[in-house]
């Protein structure tokens, strides 16, 4: 089997300016944050992001000036903020191009891309302002081959004239970047807990990069093939990055870090304090190891360690510190 192992810096360096991307995870769960920070250190620009429910992975990239356009349903860190602060600021200032969908319709778009079909029918947008409003103009869409020609299309069912559905365009990206609990060097992956839309996003991407808490033997994972929903041949690169989702949670490994998330959201409200945050935790550290030391090292990481019985930390103070 091919050895697909690569270091984090080398993996992030594969992504050029202007790439189309999706990131795995959901709000405060299992985002590939170490990879995101490495892209910021590399100075990436003009990225096109597609997602259903991203969190601070998108927010910090947007704040760092790395993103040109997003197509999404929601971007926030649940209990810490209803809308990502840098995302909100970028929209209010007209600094980012964006298009709005529902959660289900974005997952349907990834599913269409994974299946190799041009669109997917859904009902979830009917009767909503999401369907009625389109922020990307037809001229912008026509001029950019990375953007669908239309946001959506309502059609009458060819099987029942009383029935209507919405067609949403497929999403295919240059890169999908996921963080998982376990991976093998050949690209075999193990998700523990919810997969969210990671499987669809991976199969809808030309290149799949995975960061993992643990690297294990492929034969170990193959003993339970039903728990490996992405085929090894769909994965291009694997990085060993313990605590690679911090400050977000990885089920069975660690909870999200409320101290760090609180610090981020307080800093991200203001341009100057956000710049200081980036300097302290991203641009001012050499690599992921230095980042973990900067946020508090072993003492902080032990604080968020998951209980073997629960898969998360039941003792963690989650909101008001």
Kindly label every feature range from the protein language model.
Residues 1-321:
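Conserved alpha/beta enzyme-core scaffold
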